Amino acid sequence: MRVHVVSDVHGRADALAAAADGADALICLGDLLLFVDYADPGAGIFPDLFGEAAARELIGLRTAMRFDEARAFSRQLWAGLDGDPGQRIEAAAARQYAELFAAMPEPSYLTYGNVDLPRMWDAHLRPGHQVLDGQRIELDGWTFGFVGGGLRSPYRTPHELDEEDYAAKVAAIGPVDVLCAHIPPDLPELLFDTVAERMEVGSRALLDAIRVTQPRYALFGHVHQPLVSRVQIGRTECVNVGHFRATGQPFVLRW
């Protein structure tokens, strides 16, 4: 069995269409939408609405950890925009999702990232797409558990959860061969982004589950340029499957 795994697609419908070439199935660990790209400030929903210069300003404030100023800057921009902000975001997100799900291979097993809008997915799913969150499946004798979303952060992205709610989804899965999540377990070396020069938020519940149940693999994304992309915890190989928007390449899992 050969499965390809991607995360942090962030609008790369072109590469997504070929992501499962040579594989029996695709697993997608979320973050399909592109709101703003730190490496390409002209791309994404935010610059589409407010322009590249505004995106650069927002990125600069966030990178400097000036989150209150970044939020105030965003509020000022939204206040000057015609129409309802929520409707403008959803319209832009719907356009991205339509393109992404049209390119998504079948069969695909998906969970949500922290920048995704789960309520919008159903309208775009194809027959071969299965969304899993706090759920498990079996593929050719191996069990896969899926945990979607992120944890609360200063960035206030759309799909962030409280620790308790996230931990409940991890607990609902139980022991599996492969633990699939958008965010990493709470290990500093997996959470530090070397380009953004900041720590992202990881899950203690995932780390505890790995230590106790010892899956063969723990797969995740979220940190685009991690200090370390793989660590071993007992028998479990923990792997950041990569920033798909940047690389266009899936992680390959065989058994």
Q: Which stretches of residues belong to each language-model region?
A:
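Binuclear metal-dependent hydrolase catalytic cores centered on His/Asp/Glu-rich metal-binding motifs
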Residues: 140-178, 196-205
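Short hydrophobic patches on amphipathic alpha-helices
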Residues: 20, 101, 170-171, 210
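Active-site environment of divalent metal-dependent phosphoester hydrolases
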Residues: 10-15, 33-36, 111-121, 152-155, ...
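Core catalytic region of metal-dependent phosphoesterases/phosphodiesterases
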Residues: 6, 11-139, 241
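Short acidic, glycine-rich surface-loop motifs adjacent to enzyme active sites
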Residues: 173-190
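Proline-aspartate-enriched helix->loop->beta-strand connector
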Residues: 25, 176, 203-210, 214-223
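Binuclear metal-dependent phosphoesterase catalytic core
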Residues: 136-140, 157-158, 207-212, 226-255
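Active-site-proximal beta-strand elements of phosphoester/diester hydrolases
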Residues: 1-10, 141-153, 177-182, 237-242
